[in-house]
Amino acid sequence: MIARIWSGESPLWRLLLPFSWLYGLVSGAIRLSYKLGLKRAWRAPVPVVVVGNLTAGGNGKTPVVIWLVEQLQRRGVRVGVVSRGYGGKAVAYPLLLTPETTTAEAGDEPVLIYQRTGAPVAVAPERAAAVKAILAAHDVQIIITDDGLQHYRLARDIEIVVIDGVRRFGNGWWLPAGPMRERASRLKTVDAAIVNGGVARAGEIPMQLAPGLAVNLRTGARCDVAQLSNIVAMAGIGHPPRFFATLESCGAHPQKCVPLADHQTLAPADVQALVGEGQTLVMTEKDAVKCRAFAEDNWWFLPVDARLSGEKPDKLLEHITSLVR
């Protein structure tokens, strides 16, 4: 229903317009207060790059963060990552991730980024506190913030927006009548717009999510996902249909697709109940970090990597590395 409202297919979005105007006025006032200096943003002693969205829902932001961290690491840059930690609740904040940190404490995306990149990661509702925690513990040269485009209390040097190339901006309205956290005109002020799938427009960077080999949660064994039989697909991400479509494009045809809420807590019994006799469970890598502790032998995940094309990605990376002292 939400997807139909936000796309404009359902006329119910009109009933929500008063709330959208209120959302837009409040969010606009907050941004303006920082722009005019009525509120002061905290500036870190190292450059800060924000990777965020203009819309609610999954746009492929986390793969972009992982891509950016890995690209900078290959260039010899010491990178730290901060996040709000959605879906997690720590005993105390800021929380610096360790190999023992669980998704219940830090959220699924920070744990995934930490495991994939090995970069220092910290989570806190106040992102400045997370930045300070990393700087106190690690000699990093730059901070990447996972989400937080609208978190203006943290000053930033580079802003990158990730856009779903198929859904774009829906009906274009603010939440809750539409998907927008900020209006599309905000693109004029960011440093880069990365478009996940669909067709990139002038000035935008095209991106595709490239699937790798399926990985067994228990053994780490790898195989072509099309070789797995009787698949039940599970996706607890912002836009589950994208994952199911990826499986189809790989030649894997799930018998059943189970969409879950983004950042949803997964209980062992609930996940186990999805798979019947002789079936194979295939999930996203983000779900896998929540399920690995209680995984069964027939549970697999399909990792994806961001693939950016054209000359603009290299220019963006050159611009970012030029900020590092």
Swiss-Prot record:
Catalytic activity: a lipid A disaccharide + ATP = a lipid IVA + ADP + H(+)
UniProt GO molecular function: ATP binding; tetraacyldisaccharide 4'-kinase activity
Keyword Lipid metabolism carried by entry: yes
NADP listed as a keyword: no
InterPro entries found in the cross-reference section: LpxK, P-loop_NTPase
Pfam families: LpxK (PF02606)
Enzyme class: transferase
NCBIfam families per record: lpxK (TIGR00682)
Protein name: Tetraacyldisaccharide 4'-kinase
Gene name linked to the record: lpxK
